[in-house]
Amino acid sequence: MPGGKRGLVAPQNTFLENIVRRSSESSFLLGNAQIVDWPVVYSNDGFCKLSGYHRADVMQKSSTCSFMYGELTDKKTIEKVRQTFDNYESNCFEVLLYKKNRTPVWFYMQIAPIRNEHEKVVLFLCTFKDITLFKQPIEDDSTKGWTKFARLTRALTNSRSVLQQLTPMNKTETVHKHSRLAEVLQLGSDILPQYKQEAPKTPPHIILHYCAFKTTWDWVILILTFYTAIMVPYNVSFKTKQNNIAWLVLDSVVDVIFLVDIVLNFHTTFVGPGGEVISDPKLIRMNYLKTWFVIDLLSCLPYDIINAFENVDEGISSLFSSLKVVRLLRLGRVARKLDHYLEYGAAVLVLLVCVFGLVAHWLACIWYSIGDYEVIDEVTNTIQIDSWLYQLALSIGTPYRYNTSAGIWEGGPSKDSLYVSSLYFTMTSLTTIGFGNIAPTTDVEKMFSVAMMMVGSLLYATIFGNVTTIFQQMYANTNRYHEMLNNVRDFLKLYQVPKGLSERVMDYIVSTWSMSKGIDTEKVLSICPKDMRADICVHLNRKVFNEHPAFRLASDGCLRALAVEFQTIHCAPGDLIYHAGESVDALCFVVSGSLEVIQDEEVVAILGKGDVFGDIFWKETTLAHACANVRALTYCDLHIIKREALLKVLDFYTAFANSFSRNLTLTCNLRKRIIFRKISDVKKEEEERLRQKNEVTLSIPVDHPVRKLFQKFKQQKELRNQGSAQSDPERSQLQVESRPLQNGASITGTSVVTVSQITPIQTSLAYVKTSETLKQNNRDAMELKPNGGAEPKCLKVNSPIRMKNGNGKGWLRLKNNMGAHEEKKEEWNNVTKAESMGLLSEDPKGSDSENSVTKNPLRKTDSCDSGITKSDLRLDKAGEARSPLEHSPSQADAKHPFYPIPEQALQTTLQEVKHELKEDIQLLSCRMTALEKQVAEILKLLSEKSVPQTSSPKPQIPLQVPPQIPCQDIFSVSRPESPESDKDEINF
């Protein structure tokens, strides 16, 4: 296998596999430690059998097993369990829980936190052991109606159990149980595996077969193997003297190295049939003993040890020397490592040349042995002149000589010359050249030459003639595999794919190739007929059909229809099967491996063998969006079926559809989003609440003077904005209430009027600037409403004063009024004295008798005479005439009773300005006094650090009444409430 050199060595999260292996005989749950209530993300089959719940029923329930609590469950134990989870501790409890059928059972519950590579607790492991037999019988409603016999039986059973508990156990038995429990349910932080991605680990005394040391060692063994393959035939054929200490030591060192290699093979990992790396020492030893151990042992026996002794029989020495040929079995090491070396092009070329030369060397040794055996006839002690050795000796001038004293033949070519000549002959024969200077003459030599030519022709044709074709036929998948890898590498290099993603791509290709062995399943199935293809698909998906009860009632035809639609995919660690937000268009069955479901960066479920995830297509009409990511933790094999294909089969097989929808339970439904709260978020909220609780609040009471002061400023600002934005701000109405004088006297033409200002912004009579001031003169409008009559008198005072710059106070208003009087003065100068005369007196009786004030219709007509204005003023109701101050700008055609002279108008305006300035000064002084008192109170309260109390109302501050002028009314002007008093009136 091309990918078999290293095996599947990508980092993977084998936490679930390790826990299942260690707790194979127990029941356990896995809960997420980062989500509120620690929901269950995995439960093994043992817990499902013990509790009676299906895995889908247990998922997302609390790891504290609160769903199994009942009326007999101890409340204190429940609280201790929750505290253990809150504190991320390890602990064990004896707790009474209820099965799904509400049967009470005593459990020995052990809790242990699982940490990741950052030492953060991410999971909780909860193991359960049924200890009901060791506890007292549970008293519930079902046991209250027992008969006397049943109670007697229970009493006997209790007595026996008590005796067994009180009887001292055997020491060995106790140690055995303790060690067994420690092996299966050890909950120490050093023993429990971590939940993280990690490369496959090996024990300390196990060597990885792909590590640098082992790779170097394999190349050394390869070189020594070739050395053995060369020297063993040479020593056997040419009978080299074993007394050569150097060669003897070298051979002994080689033998020791091969013995060390045997020891290392007992501690070296190997690749299993599924592509996984086997690091279990027991499996490694059994595998080596069954395969290459015997061959390696025979090739490492010290056959030269006999040569270390002197006076050894020549026959025995030759026998042991011949046994050295067994060392050629070391070539098996080359065969088993051949797939390692064939991955390199230069190594392939070197190996081919070495093989050709090695065969030529072996044939040369055999060729010399034949010549040496035939050149001297041991029976007659004569030399054969037709042997190739004799002919060679004659040709090179080193003939054989007979030693009469010793009775043996001596001389002849040297061993080096003989070996070179033998190798020369075999090479020319193998390459079909054959120069003819060395040729076979005897029958044996000719027979060997024929055999050598046959082998040589085949070897030559194989290695040099058709090497490319043979490799393509023998390693077609290998060539395709390397071609695919090269294409992928070029693609990744061309588009500069990141290193991490490149490694994932390469690992996925290697792992997929190791699983499929380079065989295109779809291509093979397309060759088969429909019936055979369906049978093959049923066989390929047999694990899904046999493990899930939803397929048990399916007919053969239904299974065949489903099997054809199933697809098998292989996922590498870290691969995402579903991204959050993408469409869920397939139903996935986990056959091997483990996956995790991640929602909002939290693990909400861990899926293993036999789990199903996806969507319930047969109950939903729309295509679902994945609410979480599904990521592979290890190498996974998934069998998936598309939504359309599944619905098509269910629509056709209606009977199976009902059974399928009823019996198939999804372990994880990606359509439904799991609602949870993170413990970290809850802690943050609690910290924020505590922080706000501990903060010192700097709030001021509602009745505090400072709050009242700022509230007053705010109200004044709002009212000022409202006053400037009124739709008809031309008329600033004043409510005037007439009331009798305090002394009770009635003065003709004089009344007491209370003027309450509607707009609380102004503390004195002011003029409001309107939009019409750009076209005509500004005038003040006031309504006088006496309280005495049934029908209140409404008097409008029309002022001829023009406001150019809007509302003003103090000297600013005086300045504006002065400019207005100067303009008015010019106007009055153009009016004659006769036209400005009118009746100024009014009969008091007439005013008292009438309930309403009638307006005097004054009409002014301009004559055509130069500068003379005629007046048809009638003086029948002169007492009711209005002053020029009461002139309304809106009544342009009204009749005017009289027109005062310019000096009187100027005097009136000055008096008004004077009064207003005094009022403003008095009001400002009062407010400054009030503000000073309030500031003093604030400073006093702040210094004492006590709760401020509501200030008492401030008494009214009377203002000095200015000197009266003739026909002057007394007004009482009210202003807005201040923080010091509810009513603050100013009389003048």
Curated annotation (Swiss-Prot):
Residues 718-742, 839-897, 946-965 are annotated as: Disordered. It is a multi-pass membrane protein. Residues 721-742 have a biased composition (Polar residues). InterPro entries: cNMP-bd_dom, cNMP-bd_dom_sf, Ion_trans_dom, K_chnl_volt-dep_EAG, K_chnl_volt-dep_EAG/ELK/ERG, KCNH_animal-type, PAC, PAS. Residues 1-217, 265-291, 341-346, 468-988 are cytoplasmic. The chain crosses the membrane at residues 218-238, 244-264, 292-312, 320-340, 347-367, 447-467. Residues 871-885 have a biased composition (Basic and acidic residues). Residues 420-440 dip into the membrane without crossing it. A motif (Selectivity filter) lies at residues 432-437. Glycans are attached at residue 403. Detected in adult testis and in embryonic and adult brain, but not in other tissues. Highly expressed in specific brain areas, such as neocortex, olfactory bulb, primary olfactory cortex and brain stem. In cortex, expression is concentrated in a narrow band toward the middle lamella (layer IV). Moderately expressed in spinal cord, dorsal thalamic nuclei, medial hypothalamus, colliculus, lateral lemniscus, pontine nuclei and Islands of Calleja. Disulfide bonds: none annotated. It is found in: Membrane. One of its GO terms (cellular component) is voltage-gated potassium channel complex. Residues 704-715 are annotated as: Calmodulin-binding. Residues 239-243, 313-319, 368-419, 441-446 are extracellular. This is Voltage-gated delayed rectifier potassium channel KCNH5. It comes from Rattus norvegicus (Rat).
